């Protein structure tokens, strides 16, 4: 991969932030109703369309 433009870097940064797990305090607060993040993405298995 060559040079990344600033716009592409910004989009990849957003995707990286979205790719985190649900915080433990959210699981406790919702009494384990919310346990998984449907937007989780594996870097090798699925593409980011970038």
Swiss-Prot record:
GO biological process terms, semicolon-separated: translation
Cellular component terms per the entry's GO annotation: ribonucleoprotein complex; ribosome
Keyword Ribosomal protein: yes
Compositionally biased spans, kind Basic residues: 1-12
Top-level taxonomic group: Archaea
Gene Ontology MF terms: structural constituent of ribosome
One matching Pfam family: Ribosomal_L39
InterPro entries attached to this UniProt entry: Ribosomal_eL39, Ribosomal_eL39_CS, Ribosomal_eL39_dom_sf
Signal peptide: none
Keywords: Ribonucleoprotein, Ribosomal protein
NCBIfam families referenced in this protein's UniProt entry, alphabetically: PRK01242.1
Protein name: Large ribosomal subunit protein eL39
Organism: Haloquadratum walsbyi (strain DSM 16790 / HBSQ001)
The organism's taxonomic lineage, starting at the top: Archaea, Methanobacteriati, Methanobacteriota, Stenosarchaea group, Halobacteria
